[in-house]
Amino acid sequence: MNELIKEAYSLEVIGYIKVTKKVYKVKCREGFFCLKFVEDNGLTVVIDHIESLHLKCFLPVIRNYKKQVLTSYEDKTFYLSPWLASDNAIVKELKLKFYYECLSYLHSTSFFNYSVSKSFFKRQIEDIANIIHERQAYYNEIMSNFEVLSYRSPTGWMFVLNYHKIECCLKNALEILDCYRDYVCNLDTIRLCLTYNNFNYAHIMMKEGKLISFDHIKINLCIYDIYNMYQKIPELIFDFDVILDSYFCKLKLLKEEKLLLRCLLHVVPIIKLEHDEINNIIVMSRLLYYLDSISSLNKKLSID
């Protein structure tokens, strides 16, 4: 590996520090670098997009002597980039706010319109409707199981007393999906952009103003970055939709995007209640927090 890095990057390696299974901190006479093994050779296309659009929010990749992004080592592939020191001391709320500012910049800079057929919306709506019906059946079965029990655990009572919220949320998902169907019936384009799809506090370097990972970047609807964040909401303990203002104040969603986002967020995620009662209470509490959070965002998107 030392000889390969010297030949490919003209760097003299002193040693390696394993950070994760795929990431190594490489100490060279020229300084510190990040070596990351990747499986997706399509990353070259992503980097080309980033460089072509002159996106400043990502850590630059060091190209090898062949001017390529990726370098092969035995049966593996890796890329090399500058090493940035972690800034974990920064308050998470500030990191999250900065992350959404980066998303709004990434999305707005890379937007383009893409032509679609009528069948695209038809399939999309059918797929979402099927998922909603599956969730309704799933939660109805859990409710039925709790209803026949002579003794209910604390989790059982939490579920029974809050089942109406789940039921209402899924009902709203179907109603919003109907609104979405009515609105897109005459559309023949969608707005696509680069989406990040990989929120992680460790990837956010505020001091340098960079996101250090781009392995999961895809071309998609911008709303999926917001949707994916809400699937992680149990990990976040602050007022999520207020922090989202740092995104919405810089980027205005189209009406069809708002409707689709609202619909997807109302598709209640699946929870699994098992034999660990303490864990079950935590799972239920997180679900209730999710329902409250999307209710707040739904009002905001409806008003906007």
Question: What does each of the following model-derived ranges do?
Answer:
Residues 1-12, 164, 171, 175, ...:
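Regulatory N- and C-terminal appendages and interdomain linkers associated
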Residues 3-28, 64:
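ATP-binding glycine-rich phosphate-binding loop
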Residues 61, 174-226:
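Active-site acidic catalytic loop and adjacent metal/ATP-binding pocket
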Residues 222-253, 265-291:
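Active-site activation/catalytic loop segments of kinase-like enzymes and analogous catalytic loops
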